[in-house]
Amino acid sequence: MAQMYKIRTKNKNVYLRVAKGHFATMHSHTNYYIDVTTQKNRLSEAKAVAEELVHHYRSNTVIDTILCIDGTEVIGACMASALTRDDYINMNAHQTIYVMSPEYIGGGQMMFRDNLVPMLAGKHVLLLAASVTTGKSALAAIDAINYYGGKVVGVSAIFATVKECDGHPVHSIFNPNDLGDYESYKPHRCPKCKAGEKIEALINSYGLSML
């Protein structure tokens, strides 16, 4: 695997750490590994990411709940804090926001226990993900929100290759244009595999495992 390098923005705490190579996810093969570990787990970076994302919802979106997938709970808490500050026009009648994450059962299906359902049912829900590429995880979360009676008001991510998911707008800080030659393929259509290039690592929302 090539050495990791950073793609920076004007904000020193908002960046992507990436490496080029041949990587496999559950749903696709890609030529980039995007590491957002520090953004998800370090407070200064999480706050910076949150500030970049919340301006999309500053004054025109009711948000009762932020549903976090891919381990984005710290960012979600920072977004909730920012959206309920006095300098924001908060359209939430209760002036507070729930921050939650799903429980996973067989096949990657998401569920919520009875004590958590009131945080979704009848609520305006923002979905927060580390990345939205194939969109399958985001779609599963949207299906779960709908099943439990919530209303999806948008999707936010650090990195996304799509601008909408199931008809909902996707707002991200980074997209494939920031990488230049980003590619993602279904496993059976991967040109690197067809060329005999070995997969270097398995990647998912938890990180990377070298092969």
Where are these regions (language model features)?
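Short, glycine/charge-rich flexible loops or terminal/linker lids adjacent to PRPP-binding catalytic cores
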Residues: E73-L126
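Active-site-facing substrate-recognition patch
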Residues: M1-V62, S205-L211
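A contiguous pocket-lining binding segment that forms or flanks enzyme active sites
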Residues: M111-A157
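PRPP-dependent phosphoribosyltransferase catalytic core
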Residues: A2-K10, A140-L211
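Short, well-ordered alpha-helices that flank and scaffold nucleotide-derived cofactor binding pockets
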Residues: H55, S81, R85, D143, ...
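Short amphipathic alpha-helix with an adjacent loop that forms part of the alpha/beta core around
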Residues: R58-S59, D114-M119, P187
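Short, well-ordered alpha-helical microsegments
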Residues: E73-A77, G135, K163
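Short glycine-rich phosphate-binding loop at a beta-alpha junction
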Residues: T61-T72
